[in-house]
Structure formats: structure tokens, C-alpha cells
């Protein structure tokens, strides 16, 4: 019997209070509520977790060991579950080889397309490449000097896993003696079995010949090699290695391309990857700003930071460099900036002729050398690659920075792969197009009837995947964009596009705020995509705060009423209309307009000082000039991909950080930033975790734990026992429980089952030993305090002003419900960001601090957004400047100044459409933001305004 509802009984996961609920199936369901109310606990930790657990229980014990933890959620019963797929925001890969193209698998289809219908062109002569005849190959060999030792090889295996035992036995029977395996020539008889799990390259040594005028032996050997390897032969000399192909080679210069296969176009395979950067597109090179941070100093004064401590010493390395300095007459007392550029280049990059010099060892041995002397830069780069010492690697690495690969110029592929064209573009040029441009290119692609027949299915698949990405508002992304640079919302929408393409039915999808990072203009597309998935016969459970998405849903579950211990209940459940009419629902109050975030009565004009970015050209920015008034709340808006992050993060933030001394941070491209003297500190408040380990928590991050430990150390009991504040730290020996080393939990390995975490049996999860827990303050131990919520701690420490002030800031940012000792790893991105905000609120304002936030409303309910705006306004009231990238209209309407980017995403963006107050933006007809802002400001006028300044 097909059940029409998912029925949940007795859910108690995290803060859920034994709730029971019926959710209609095959509908678009929104779960909402204030931050910390329990909506994620219900959607992901209960419903999805149980669906996943039931699937995993159907697998064998052997398979389960590879799939992580499948612990049963704390719930009595769930009926009506479908197979569950979670599409969350924690899926962005940090792998530098992962791109939008590889994640969506479009690049895999592209590789197949280029391998099947691509035409190779000579990169130097721009003519189509055809196969070499044996005569042409021999003509090339005859150009070599007489008596050159030549080896003819036949590449029979290229990067394939396996022992290749059958092939090796066959070669031995046919009389071959030597092979080159993975670059090393070996005798077949002495060959040890190959590792079956590794990729191997095997070239058969066909013949070894000393070059003379006899062409016949070369002809026979090349013919044999070509036959063995299906058209390929390698000429190996002491000086070089040349690939011959009877399939593809330039008639003029002999440039050869191997047989076109998909792996040739993979930057993750040795045959396709650029040999210099190994397919990364970047290499680590010495950054002169790190090597010479102050060019007003001379070499003798330590101007070259690498040599600051060894100038004029007996160090052998310095003796070599000093010989180079002496030979080229480089003055060690002249400021580096005044040295002739040619002489400085010799010092940095090495001599252009051999130099005679002496080395004096500490033992007194003198050795005479006559050789090229390596410059500082190549020497640092070489030592970084060669050293096995972690400390040395860090030291050499401190002078290096990522730079575009000089060989492939960021394309990641080798010359042969980049020579193959389809529609006049190589595969790298194809991936540089935006999704929108790629769709147009594929629609206009002209092919011969034969090519069209071969590529029909591949092109159809590529077009489908591109259109799905376009459908969810990602038309501005390029396929070569690194996955690690995607926002949580972008990564989630890519996964959403993949699921739309799969066209599965009868599935339960659980999504986490898919509207994040999406401009209001693109939201309708996303809602349409969600409805399409629902109409296929799927159930969509979406954790969401966006009002438009809620109004478009079939059913809303409002979890609350408050956060933490004050939440965990179902406040209301029903259609959007029923929620709006429910007096108990705070969500309904905002949806119906009973509650709202008011428009400020006045807009600040700033303190008279400004920051000005001149001619910014990073990524898609088109030489834009932007002025930010200091002492204001400024919001940067625009459709997705319009250039907001490029301007705010890469150009302005990184530029200021670099100017303020953080030299390893590379500023984005712009002519200059004016007004830097008006800023003494820049604070980026992102949604990255406040710590990577369970030891990090809100109390330690905000510094309030130091004050609490001081307080415990001053108690009569602590003084009697001789305990100082260090005794009350769970990170060091002394006061902590040594059985769990202050973690409070123990990990038990279960081999074929997931690891189990249990409370430490020595301390009972309290982190401290018995002696430390004998000390009490107002009847509570240090472990009891860590277990308090911010709200409870505020009341407990109400008489201790220093502690109360820090706790109050946590309370003010809406985190009254989190525990002081709550593990950083359990905090959401929005919660982590607000902990950081609270930490900054504690500090004394300088009036010269710039706060930068990227979409701070992520994960926030309208009621939380109201609190966030109040906190941001407080920072500005203290005299500092707040700069925010945001799509949330409630935040935008409260700004003093808006910088609207656009008009479109990708190459269609990168310009400033309009700047000014929200009222000015609302009147700008070219601004998409203004079109959505205008009705809100008109509503604000109808309801009156609040004084936020």
C-alpha cells in the first residue's frame, strides 16, 4: 500500500522535544524556524539519517565499513520513508583538481567529444596534422649528427593498471629482450611482477642503432615499432625523445600527436597533463614581495629576507652567492631598489656563464669550482622540492606563492592535447566559456554529417547538463572554475542540477537552503526547478528561510518557538495560508506582514573619509572605480556572478590585507586603492568554523573562558590547593582527565562497523579529573559552567562585569541557546559567524576598522536577520565601517550606501550599475536589485520607519 504521508513519532534528536508529525509525500515541504530551533535536527538528523540508515542496513557488513557512521537517530518510529538523498552545503571539494566541469561530469563528455571528432592542428604552423610516413620519420632521424646513439621504442601500454603478465610473456616469446617500464629500461628476464594497483607505461625496445647513412635498418625497426603499438614509435637519444605517429604529425615541423583517446584530454592523467605543473595549472614560484619585503634595505642589511641571518658568514650557500655577487660587481651596501635590474636578475636567477670560485669548509678544506652558479630563486624552489624536513619545507615555502604555470599558462594540459580543436576551440578554451556561452556555442556548432552522427549522443548529454545548470541560476559559472572557490549555495545548486538531470522518481530529497547566494531575480528559476523535481513524483523537504520559496511551497513546518532549549517543538504545520493565519507562528507573522524589519529613518553620510578602488579588473571586473564612504553600513549587491566577491574579497580585502603587512595574500588586479591610511585593521567575518577540533568552543574563541578560569583560580578552594588558572584548562596536563586528554569522549574502533564514540568512563564526559572538580564557584564546577547555555551563564555571572559583558555580546547576536563548551564542529556556518561577530563586539572600537561579511544572513530566519542588522548597525555606531555582500532585501534596505553590480553574471557583469542610498537604487531602472527593493521601501513608508542610526 502506497502511503501518502511520512509519519514521525517521538523525535528527540538534539533539542527536539519528543515531537510527532505527519508530512505529505510528493510535495514541496519547507522546514523553517529561528536559528537553533531544531529544523535541521528534524530534517537532516532525524528524517534523512533514518532513511540513510535503513538503506545502509540492507548492505553487507563488509560494505558498511566504507560508508561511515549509521547511528540510529533518537526517534521512536518513522513510517512512509522513501529512499533519501541529501543535497547540503558541505560538499565543496578542496581538491585543486576538482572543477565545475569535473564535478558535473560535463568535462568527461567533452573529453569523449574531442577524442572522437577532434582535429589536431600544428600549434606553430596552424595546419591540420596528418600521419607521418616511415620515409618522413627516417628523414627526421637523418638530421641527427653521425654516431648518435638511437633507441627505437614501441609504446604498447600507456598508463594502464595491471600486472600485464600476458603481454610480457608474449614479448619474451617473440624474442624481445628489453622494455622501458615507467621510464626505466629493464631486461624482460629480470623483470619483477608489476603492481596491479598502479598505472604503468610499457615501451618495447625494438632496436638500438648508431646513426649512419644506412636507412634500411631504421626502416625495418620503425615498421616493427609502428605495428606493435598501432601506429606509434619513439626515437630516444641521449639528448631528446621524439614521438612519431603514422596517425598524426605535422608535415612541416614533424610535431606529433598520439592516437586521440579521452585520457589525452584529462589533466589528471600523465598522458594529458602538462609535464611542468602535473595538471594543476599552477606552480610554486618565489614571490619577490616575500623574498624582498623591503627593497629600501641593502643586501648587507638583510634586504633579501632569505639571507638576513647568514650574510658575511662561512655558510657554503652564502659563499656561492657571494662569489656571484663578486663576479657581477653587485654592491652589497646599495638599497636593492637602486641596484641595476640586470645585476639583480643575476643574483635572483643565476649566472649566464660559468664562474670560478673557491669554497672553504669549516674543517679547513678548500675546493675550487668552475660552474654556473644557481640564483636565489631557483635554489629556493629546488630545495623546497628536495627537502624531507617539515621545518625546512615550511621555511622555503614561506618565500613561495602560487603562480600560473609558465609552460601551459594555466591550461593544465600538454601541447598535444591543446592542439586538438572542435569548432575552432581547444578543450581548455571550451571550459573557459560560461555556461550560457557554452550553450550558445553548442547550438551553433557546425559539423560534417559524419561528425554529427558520431557525436550525436555525446552532444545531447552535454547540452542537457548545461541547460540544467542554467536552469538553477548558474549560467555565469565557467567549467574551469575550481570547485573549492564555489560558495555553499553554488555547490548545492550544482548537485541539484545533477539530480534534475537524473530524473529519478519516488525519492525523498532533503535540501539545506538552496536559495543561498541567489539574487531575487534568479529565485523564480530555482523554485521552478524544485517544483519540476516534485512533479516527477518526489518528496522535497527543504530547510529554508526565503519568503518567496515558502509562499511557493505546498506545506510548511515551523519549528520553534525559540532556539536551543526554547525550541524543538512544532509551532505550526500546514499550507502557507494556514501558517500566515497562525498567531503562534513567528514565521507566519513575517509572511503575513504582521511583523517586519523596519526601514531606518535616516541614512548615514559617513565620517568624511573614503576608500577608493581605482580601475579594478580582477576576473570579470571591467576597470571599475568604486568609492566606499567610511563610517557607514555599505552593502554590495548584484545578480550571482556579477563581480561582487571579485571586488570586495579579491580586490579590496586582499589589497588592504597586503598593504597592512600580510604579504602572502595576493591582491586582486586594480590600479590602486586610495585612502588606505584611513584603515588600521580589516576583519573578515566568514562562515568558516571557529575551530577544526572538538576542543574549540564559543567560550575559548571569545576569550570568556580565560576570565572564567581566572575566577575559579581565585576561589578559596583553589588557593588552598595551590591551583592557578592553568589547572582549569582541558588542553594541558594537570587539571584535565588524562584518560580522554580533556576531550570528554573516547573513540572505540569497531573494525567492520563504524567507530563508536562514548563518554569517557573516568571523567563521565566532564573533561577534568576529580581533583579539579573539587573546586566550586557558587556551587558549580568548571565542567558545570561549560555545560551552561549563554542564557544560563549570563544569569550565573550577572555580578562579574567582565564575564557578563562578553556573554552579553553572544546573547545580543542571537546565540543565547548555545552552550559555552559546545564543540566548534557542531556549530553551523551562521552560528560560527555570529560567534566571531560577538568576539569583535567585545573589542574597543578604533574608528579605523573595516568589517567585511559575505552573505551573513545564511541560515538566518527573518527574526534572526533583524538581530543581525542591529548588531551590524552597532559596529557602525562605534565609528567603524561595515561592508557586506548580500542578497537579502531586508539587509539591503537598511544600508546607508549600496553598490549595485551587474547587469548580468559572468562576462555580462563586472560593472557598477548604480551607487547610493537604497532609495536611489530603487529609482534606477537598470538595476535588478532596485526593482525588487522599490516595493519594500514603499511598504516601509506606509508603516513608518525606525531609527537605526
Segments and roles (model prediction):
Residues 1-949:
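Conserved phosphate-binding elements of NTP-dependent enzyme cores
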Amino acid at each position: 500500500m502506497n502511503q501518502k504521508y511520512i509519519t514521525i513519532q517521538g523525535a528527540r534528536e538534539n533539542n527536539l522535544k519528543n515531537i510527532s508529525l505527519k508530512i505529505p509525500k510528493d510535495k514541496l515541504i519547507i522546514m523553517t524556524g529561528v536559528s537553533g530551533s531544531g529544523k535541521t535536527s528534524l530534517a537532516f538528523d532525524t528524517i534523512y539519517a533514518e532513511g540513510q540508515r535503513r538503506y545502509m542496513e540492507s548492505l553487507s557488513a563488509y560494505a558498511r565499513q566504507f560508508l561511515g557512521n549509521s547511528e540510529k537517530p533518537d526517534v521512536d518510529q518513522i513510517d512512509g520513508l522513501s529512499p533519501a538523498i541529501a543535497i547540503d552545503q558541505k560538499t565543496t571539494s578542496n581538491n585543486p583538481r576538482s572543477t565545475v566541469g569535473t564535478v558535473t561530469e560535463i568535462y568527461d563528455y567533452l573529453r569523449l567529444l574531442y577524442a572522437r571528432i577532434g582535429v589536431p592542428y600544428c600549434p606553430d604552423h596552424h595546419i591540420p596534422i596528418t600521419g607521418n610516413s616511415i620515409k618522413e620519420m627516417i628523414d627526421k632521424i637523418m638530421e641527427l649528427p653521425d654516431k648518435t646513439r638511437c633507441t627505437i621504442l614501441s609504446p604498447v601500454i600507456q598508463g594502464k593498471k595491471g600486472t600485464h603478465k600476458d603481454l610480457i610473456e608474449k614479448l619474451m616469446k617473440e624474442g624481445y629482450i628489453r622494455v622501458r617500464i615507467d621510464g626505466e629500461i629493464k631486461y624482460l628476464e629480470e623483470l619483477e611482477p608489476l603492481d596491479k594497483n598502479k598505472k604503468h607505461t610499457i615501451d618495447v625496445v625494438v632496436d638500438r642503432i648508431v646513426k649512419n647513412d644506412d636507412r634500411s635498418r631504421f626502416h625495418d625497426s620503425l615498421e616493427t615499432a609502428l605495428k606493435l603499438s598501432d601506429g606509434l614509435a619513439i626515437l630516444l637519444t641521449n639528448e631528446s625523445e621524439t614521438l612519431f605517429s603514422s596517425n598524426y604529425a605535422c608535415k612541416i615541423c614533424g610535431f606529433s600527436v598520439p592516437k586521440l583517446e579521452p585520457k589525452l584530454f584529462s589533466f589528471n592523467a600523465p598522458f594529458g597533463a602538462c609535464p611542468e605543473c602535473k595538471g594543476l595549472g599552477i606552480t610554486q614560484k618565489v614571490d619577490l614581495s616575500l623574498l624582498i619585503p623591503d627593497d629600501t634595505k641593502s643586501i648587507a642589511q638583510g634586504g633579501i629576507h632569505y639571507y638576513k641571518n647568514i650574510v658575511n658568514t662561512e655558510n657554503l650557500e652564502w659563499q656561492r652567492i657571494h662569489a656571484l655577487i663578486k663576479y657581477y660587481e653587485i654592491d652589497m651596501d646599495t638599497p636593492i631598489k637602486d641596484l641595476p635590474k640586470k645585476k639583480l636578475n643575476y643574483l635572483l636567477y643565476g649566472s649566464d656563464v660559468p664562474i670560478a670560485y673557491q669554497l672553504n669548509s669549516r674543517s679547513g678544506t678548500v675546493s675550487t669550482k668552475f660552474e654556473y652558479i644557481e640564483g636565489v630563486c631557483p635554489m629556493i624552489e629546488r630545495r623546497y622540492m628536495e627537502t624531507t624536513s617539515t621545518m625546512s619545507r615550511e621555511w622555503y615555502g614561506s618565500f613561495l606563492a602560487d603562480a600560473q604555470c609558465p609552460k601551459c599558462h594555466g591550461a593544465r594540459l600538454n601541447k598535444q592535447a591543446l592542439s586538438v580543436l572542435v569548432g575552432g576551440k581547444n578543450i581548455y578554451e571550451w571550459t573557459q566559456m560560461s555556461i550560457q556561452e557554452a550553450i550558445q556555442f553548442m547550438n551553433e556548432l557546425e559539423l560534417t554529417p559524419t561528425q554529427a552522427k558520431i557525436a550525436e549522443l555525446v552532444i545531447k548529454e552535454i547540452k542537457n547538463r548545461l541547460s540544467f545548470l542554467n536552469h538553477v541560476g548558474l549560467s555565469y559559472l565557467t567549467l574551469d572554475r575550481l570547485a573549492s572557490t564555489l560558495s555553499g549555495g553554488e555547490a548545492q545548486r550544482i548537485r541539484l542540477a545533477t539530480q534534475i538531470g537524473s530524473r529519478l522518481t519516488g525519492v525523498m530529497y532533503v535540501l539545506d537552503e538552496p536559495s543561498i547566494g541567489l539574487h531575487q531575480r534568479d529565485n523564480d528559476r530555482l523554485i521552478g526547478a524544485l517544483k519540476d523535481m516534485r512533479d516527477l513524483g518526489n518528496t522535497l523537504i527543504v530547510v529554508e528561510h526565503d519568503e518567496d520559496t515558502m509562499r511557493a511551497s505546498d506545506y510548511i513546518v515551523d519549528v520553534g518557538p525559540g532556539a536551543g532549549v526554547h525550541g524543538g517543538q512544532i509551532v505550526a504545520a500546514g499550507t502557507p495560508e494556514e501558517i500566515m493565519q497562525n498567531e503562534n507562528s513567528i514565521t507566519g507573522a513575517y509572511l503575513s506582514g504582521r511583523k517586519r524589519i523596519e526601514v531606518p529613518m535616516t541614512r548615514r553620510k559617513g565620517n568624511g573619509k573614503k576608500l577608493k578602488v581605482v580601475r579594478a579588473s580582477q576576473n570579470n571586473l571591467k576597470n571599475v572605480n568604486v568609492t566606499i564612504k567610511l563610517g557607514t553600513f555599505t552593502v554590495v549587491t548584484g545578480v550571482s556572478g556579477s563581480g561582487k566577491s571579485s571586488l570586495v574579497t579579491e580586490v579590496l580585502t586582499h589589497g588592504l590585507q597586503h598593504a597592512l603587512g600580510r604579504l602572502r595574500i595576493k591582491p586582486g588586479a586594480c590600479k590602486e586603492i586610495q585612502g588606505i591610511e584611513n584603515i588600521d585593521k580589516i576583519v573578515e567575518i566568514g562562515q568558516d568554523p571557529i575551530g577544526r577540533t572538538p576542543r574549540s568552543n564559543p567560550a575559548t574563541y571569545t576569550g570568556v573562558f580565560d576570565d572564567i578560569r581566572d575566577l575559579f583560580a581565585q576561589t578559596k578552594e583553589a588557593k588552598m590547593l595551590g591551583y592557578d588558572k592553568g589547572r582549569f584548562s582541558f588542553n594541558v596536563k594537570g587539571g584535565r582527565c588524562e584518560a580522554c586528554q580533556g576531550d570528554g569522549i573516547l573513540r572505540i574502533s569497531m573494525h567492520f562497523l563504524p567507530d563508536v564514540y562514548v563518554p569517557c568512563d573516568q571523567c563521565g564526559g566532564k573533561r577534568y579529573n576529580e581533583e579539579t572538580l573539587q573546586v566550586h564557584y557558587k556551587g558549580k564546577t568548571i565542567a558545570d559552567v561549560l555545560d551552561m547555555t549563554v542564557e544560563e551563564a549570563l544569569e550565573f555571572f550577572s555580578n562579574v562585569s567582565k564575564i557578563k559583558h562578553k556573554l552579553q555580546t553572544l546573547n545580543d547576536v542571537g546565540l543565547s541557546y548555545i552552550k559555552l563548551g559546545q564543540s566548534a564542529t557542531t556549530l553551523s556556518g551562521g552560528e560560527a559567524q555570529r560567534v566571531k561577530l560577538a568576539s569583535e563586539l567585545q573589542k574597543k572600537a578604533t574608528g579605523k576598522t573595516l568589517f567585511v561579511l559575505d552573505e551573513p544572513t545564511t541560515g538566518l530566519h527573518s527574526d534572526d536577520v533583524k538581530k543581525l542588522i542591529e548588531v551590524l548597525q552597532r559596529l557602525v555606531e562605534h565609528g567603524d565601517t561595515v561592508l557586506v555582500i548580500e542578497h537579502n532585501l531586508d539587509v539591503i534596505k537598511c544600508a546607508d550606501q549600496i553598490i549595485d553590480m551587474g547587469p548580468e553574471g559572468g562576462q555580462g557583469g563586472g560593472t557598477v550599475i548604480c551607487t547610493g542610498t537604497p532609495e536611489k537604487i530603487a529609482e534606477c531602472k537598470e538595476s535588478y536589485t532596485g526593482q525588487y527593493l522599490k516595493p519594500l521601501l514603499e511598504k516601509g513608508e506606509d508603516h513608518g520607519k525606525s531609527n537605526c542610526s
